[in-house]
Amino acid sequence: MQAGVVATPRALDPVWAERLHRLRGRGWAVIPVASIIGVIFAIRYASSTATWLTYLALVAVPILAAVALGWLGRGARPWLALVAVGLFVVTWRTPYSLAGEAAGALLSGLSCVTLGVLLSAITPSRWLKLGIVAMACADTWLIASNQLQAPNNVLVAAKPSGGLPQLQSEQFGTVTLGYGDLFVAALLGGVYASRLRVQRIAAVLTLAVASVFDLLFLVVDNLPATVPVALALLIAEIGLAGGRLRGSGQAGETASLSEYCDRSRPEDAIPPPAT
């Protein structure tokens, strides 16, 4: 699931990138780590936060998924936004079936794609990469110190009234993922969205690392699912820095990591003084 989310974001077109330019700044890189630490401690000290997040997800996830299907995902078409309605209905009407669980997971993953594209558009690439690694470190610390499990159980158990679907976490068969686990994957996809080949390699790396990482479930009950994404990022960056990995942009050009940051993200540079 995470690998698919990594492969889905596409870069904003120049018009929208220019519109969002005024919002661009390093501070947005705090969002990944703040999202996991903030949610866990908010639920820990105010359990009603879980109920509020349940209703927030109920409203926001289908809308964000529709945006991904109609605009910000690879292969997006405006009419595909209607697919989100169908996925929501399947999730709602068949909540305990594999079809319902799969539809819910797709909605959550697609909603994260929208968030990943938008956040990567307003955050300098190098800072967002640091944010991904910081999120994985925070996730690992919370699990190792047993501070994540209890609040997470409260969040997973929270249900909206009226039999409406739970969209704040993902359950597919025996696999459970938190929303943040898909969010971090979307951030990785957003980082490389302008370099299709690198993005695809990052998705494959995420799948490979996660498959090996999951073997640890043989000896432990809880694992930070953000870690495989961060490791995939680090491996990709090592390949880019060593010149062994080069990616094509949407216009077909190739660039090394430093060239790409300098050339395709000129807004990161300090503008010349006004005269």
Regions found by a protein language model. Name each.
Residues 1-275:
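A membrane-topology feature that recognizes alpha-helical transmembrane segments
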